[in-house]
């Protein structure tokens, strides 16, 4: 397992959000959680090979609109763990990780937004977690 400790991924002026962790060591998701905890959640899912930083300009607007904004870095991307096994970066592993994350955070009435691979993951999550997802934007 490799966790990114590159200086370029920390202390970013345009991305001043606290990093939270979910999952076991070696396959933990890094994510940000901004806005009121009881507000309606929106989950922003990035494409590959980028990371949550791609959403830096929209996060403040969504928080200002009164939403709870959650932005996970997919496994193998950004600040999330980078398991050495190729299968750990596959669609199934990403879906399992994100599904468990949504369950453990108790997300409901969630809007999922995805771009690129994040769009495919959002679509699949909307099916797998239909009781938690209210809206889908691709």
Listing of model-derived features with the role each one plays in the protein:
Residues 1-42, 64-67, 107-108:
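Alpha/beta-hydrolase fold catalytic core
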Residues 26, 32, 71-113:
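Active-site loop/oxyanion-hole signature of alpha/beta-hydrolase fold enzymes
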Residues 32-81:
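Conserved HGGG/HGGXW glycine-rich cap/lid loop of the alpha/beta-hydrolase fold
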Residues 54, 94, 125:
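Acidic donor-diphosphate engagement hotspot in glycosyltransferases and nucleotidyltransferases
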Residues 107-138:
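Conserved hydrolase catalytic core segment
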């Amino acid at each position: 397992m490799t966790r990114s400790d590159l200086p370029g991924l920390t202390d970013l002026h345009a991305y001043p959000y606290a990093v939270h962790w979910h999952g076991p060591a070696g396959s933990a998701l890094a994510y940000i959680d901004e806005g009121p905890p009881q507000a309606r959640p929106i989950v922003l899912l990035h494409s590959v090979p980028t990371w949550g930083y791609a959403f830096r300009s929209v996060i403040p607007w969504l928080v200002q609109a009164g939403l709870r904004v959650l932005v996970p870095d997919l496994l193998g991307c950004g600040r999330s763990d980078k398991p050495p096994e190729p299968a750990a970066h596959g669609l199934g592993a990403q879906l399992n990780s994100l599904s468990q994350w949504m369950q453990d955070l108790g997300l409901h009435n969630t809007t999922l937004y995805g771009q690129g691979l994040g769009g495919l993951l959002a679509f699949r999550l909307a099916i797998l977690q239909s009781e938690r997802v209210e809206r889908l934007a691709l």
